[in-house]
Amino acid sequence: MMMDEDVEQASLMSFNDRPRAFPNMRSKTYSPLIFRIIRKLNVRVLSIILLFCFGAIFYMGASTSPIIVFVFTVCIISFLLSIYLTKWVLAKDEGPPEMVEISDAIRDGAEGFFRTQYSTISKMAILLAFVILCIYLFRSLTPQQEAAGLGRAMSAYITVAAFLLGALCSGIAGYVGMWVSVRANVRVSSAARRSAREALQIAVRAGGFSALVVVGMAVIGIAILYSTFYVWLGVGSPGSMNVTDLPLLLVGYGFGASFVALFAQLGGGIYTKGADVGADLVGKVEQGIPEDDPRNPAVIADLVGDNVGDCAARGADLFESIAAEIISAMILGGTMAKKCKIEDPSGFILFPLVVHSFDLIISSIGILSIKGTRDASVKSPVEDPMAVLQKGYSLTIILAVITFGASTRWLLYTEQAPSAWFNFALCGLVGIITAYIFVWISKYYTDYKHEPVRTLALASSTGHGTNIIAGVSLGLESTALPVLTISVAIISAYWLGNTSGLVDENGIPTGGLFGTAVATMGMLSTAAYVLTMDMFGPIADNAGGIVEMSQQPESVREITDLLDAVGNTTKATTKGFAIGSAALASFLLFSAYMDEVSAFANVSFKEVDIAIPEVFVGGLLGAMLIFLFSAWACAAVGRTAQEVVNEVRRQFIERPGIMEYKEKPDYSRCVAIVASAALREMIKPGALAIASPIVVGLVFRILGYYTGQPLLGAKVVASMLMFATVCGILMALFLNTAGGAWDNAKKYIETGALGGKGSEAHKAAVTGDTVGDPFKDTAGPSIHVLIKMLATITLVMAPVFL
């Protein structure tokens, strides 16, 4: 798509003569305690502390493996690059004062909610850490842990420390996503007055900063834990723990990351969609005013929600995905290396860390490939922003194929099976292709350039009911291709792994599960660039809101509308990517759970027979959990939206001058209502997700004790996990795609199709968009986290079920 001259070269004229309805709400910027402490330190003291920390990290890495040193080096370089991207973005101008005022209010709202939300989450995390400590002090140990002298107390402290570190890193990942978004949005708005390309580049680099930090922290956090435990426990020395058993000590890290990600996604999703739905129902439908109009009392809450829901929550979500995938792959790699009696198993265990280190390198190249702004005096059309992002993604994919092949040859070559590395390289290629197909499928079903969304828009012309029917049917249909893709990927990767030539002492092939692990790594090998595209969406959305509220020329709004439409598509495609990776990661975690049960029970645990009534009931409970969780998440958005609607209606009735710009809306009141409701509503579905597998496992463990079935608790939980994963994948695909399609059908009509804004088709499309909001931004993304968190909970609690 090409943009016209008047879109590319927007007017810079001042609009100060237009009426405004916006108060200056700026207050002191919030930052977490750890950052405030660092700021107060003397520069020399801080430098010495950093040098000491880096020295300690590299010492532990050198004492562990040269591979860990490579991982540490890449992560630190990526952090330095992210600092460069931050400075580059913050060096851009913020535009006129009216833009800055709006941006400041959004920043205040986002940081205020973040502070309250994460304070609540941290208290719950500390309480859960205490529960885990008590449970682990009375749990059983694996024979290998007992032989290595690892007592219950030591095991408990290690798991709790890993849990708290995972929770902390996940929280920081969320904060980083929000921090950059609330500072980049106004700079994108300002750049849109000059050039669409400049606005695009700022949004991409801001998203890139967050992505590199999130992925880098996931990798370096696990690497630090691994090397610390390796040195501390004397792994590899006579009488100590075997290196192949070490990854089991890391499961707490994945659980901590999942715990924070779930509540971040729930709270952020309820906030953003409660505000969005409430603002749309009264503003667009009842009052007939445009989106992001300054007369709407809920508009600031809506814009704040983009940051806490789409940026902070998505950062924590992908952090958790990567952490869970790395840990499960390390467990499976260690198990396979032990079965095959590979002389140096470190390559198979540390392979996931190296893959994601290369991810940081190639994604950085992809981000920097989005070239700078042309001279503003050059009046020529530019490429479609989606095409620009797609070129960067294609470059990243090509580099991923090359680096993945090099990584497999470097780390997975073994004399026992000289060609095994090539089979695993093909497994990685399967994962990379799967990721690309998932992105394409999501784009096809949610981009208004393609038939499905246009058909949905056409259905809007005959009323609200036909819009809803068409959207639901589109969402249901959209599950078919992804499921077929996942099925082919799992079977292909398993077959390639099984035929790699790696066999156990009985000559039985053992590489199948590790092959699926490698495919999952391949799918996530471009995660940093995918997260960049995801972060681009809410930044562009916020920029459009700032432009609308500051009443900039229509040509500027056209640029931000275009970026916003592309952002909607990238958000939808990255959600497809996220659920695909969650599906493969959950399969890995399920396999890792079975390996862990085998290790603790000291008996083979390879099959789950659903013909056993209790096991079948566990599966039913898992499927039910997905539906009940989704219902509670959507209902939470509905209740929050009702509070917002009542407040906005009250303000319009009591302050009739708002519509004529004679009175200012009370924006802060809506922000407070949404924040309070989101924090209140996130507890119930979150508690359901955490308590369900633990309660089910304990109940059936007791039942198994009295019926002479010692592994019944573990089997029922395995069945619950299996069914919940299958139902969760399908439900998330339906919710994400239907919601994204409804949103872009509305955007398509707003471009002028089928009567444009204000038409009957547009009103029906707004209804569909309203229904789709909690689907795609609350329930759907939360299910991504839920199915992985169920797996990490079972990994941590597996000894309790025996």
Curated annotation (Swiss-Prot):
Name the protein family: Belongs to the H(+)-translocating pyrophosphatase (TC 3.A.10) family. K(+)-insensitive subfamily.
Tell me what organism the protein belongs to.
Arabidopsis thaliana (Mouse-ear cress)
Annotated Mg(2+) 1 binding lies at D276, D280
Q: Which residues bind Mg(2+) 2?
A: D276, D773
- Residues of the site described as Important for proton transport: D310, D317, D777, K788
Q: What is its EC number?
A: 7.1.3.1
Membrane spanning stretches: 45-65, 66-86, 118-138, 160-180, 206-226, 246-266, 348-368, 386-406, 421-441, 468-488, 511-531, 577-597, 615-635, 686-706, 716-736, 782-802
Function text: Pyrophosphatase active in both inorganic pyrophosphate hydrolysis and H(+) translocation.
Chain positions recorded as Mg(2+) 4 binding sites: N568, D743
The protein's name is Pyrophosphate-energized membrane proton pump 2
Means of activity regulation: Activated by Mg(+) but not by K(+). Inhibited by Ca(2+).
Read off the Pfam families from this record.
H_PPase (PF03030)
* Primary gene name: AVPL1
At the top of the EC hierarchy, this enzyme's class is translocase
GO CC aspect terms: endosome; Golgi apparatus; Golgi cis cisterna; Golgi membrane; trans-Golgi network; vacuole
Q: Does the record carry Membrane as a key word?
A: yes
Tissue specificity of this protein = Ubiquitous. Mostly expressed in cotyledons, roots and flowers. Especially high levels in trichomes, sepals and stamen filaments.
Q: Which proteins does it associate with, and in what oligomeric form?
A: Monomer.
Source domain of life: Eukaryota
| Swiss-Prot/TrEMBL catalytic activity | diphosphate + H2O + H(+)(in) = 2 phosphate + 2 H(+)(out)
Q: Provide the binding site for Mg(2+) 3.
A: D306, D541
